[in-house]
Amino acid sequence: MNAVYLAALTIIFTACANPNAKKLDTATEGTIHISVDETYKPLIDSEIKVFQSLYPQAHIIPTYKPEVECFRDLLNDSARMVIVTRDLNAEERDYFDKVKIVPNSLLLAWDAVALVVNRSNPDSVLKMDQVRGIMDGSNKDRKWQIVFDNANSSTVRYIKDSINKGKPLPPGTMAAKTNPEVIDYVSKNKDAIGVIGVSWISDPSDSLTIDFTNKVTVVKLRADYGSDYVGPYQYYIGTGAYPLKRGLFYCLKEPYHGLGTGFATFLGSYEGQLVIKQFRLFPARSNVVFREANLK
């Protein structure tokens, strides 16, 4: 009788002896809690809805919060899975090495940060030099009130790291708590410029998206080496013509093939990537073909 067979028998007898033993979730059944960057709420709500329609015994409960808190949850065992805008960094991987855990992460899509202004604001077309000047406070052409969702959000980190290159945000920069509140504030203040995740304004079939885009103007940007001013739309995100581009990742630490693994696999599958495509992000795990239209 080999060791593998003995181990299997031990598991069976243990389960029979203790009928109240906690049942582990599987790739398609059970309940898990995940932490998700709040800029992705519309997208991930839709992904979960589709996944649970395919697997009715699966129950994924998301908590939407700032990205900093998502990684904190992953490190302190409050969440097995997080959905965020960056991969694990070297410090985080070193931590998992020390505790003998092998995390799994994957780029799912290319996403974008969108800038929105009041509908009465004439400055809805900007060069990247102007954006940098607004975000670090060096642009003195006019008064701007910058509004983010949260001081610990991924959009704040993105602007500080990728646009300001470590320079601080100007004094008076505001945090409005949520992306919808950013949009609401901008709609009521003519000098405001809001920084949000593009998935809040990218689904043209969603009534909430339509309401948001009717309230504010989405800023068109010109990349440093570009010639056209473009919005944060799927084609321009994919080609890199839209300059405020970032990734969408899952990070998973699951010691067995449980529901986190099942949901992660789904997100990278055809069905999961189709939802990403419908939200006008650029899928990283499937091909997107753009065809020229002949208008007559």
Roles of regions detected by a PLM:
Residues S35, I61, R80-I83:
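Short, conserved beta-strand segments within well-ordered enzyme catalytic domains
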Residues Q57-F71:
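Central regulatory/effector-binding core of bacterial HTH transcription factors
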Residues C16-Y55, L75, L106-A109, V117-K296:
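Exported/periplasmic ABC-transporter solute-binding proteins
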Residues K65, I83-R86, E91, K177, ...:
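Short beta-strand and adjacent tight-turn residues that come in two discontinuous sequence segments
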Residues M1-T14:
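Sec-dependent bacterial lipoprotein signal peptides
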Residues V68-V99, P204:
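Pocket-flanking alpha-helical
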Residues A114:
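Basic (Lys/Arg-enriched) interaction patch that binds polyanionic ligands
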Residues K100-N104:
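Periplasmic N-terminal soluble interaction domains immediately after the signal peptide in Gram-negative
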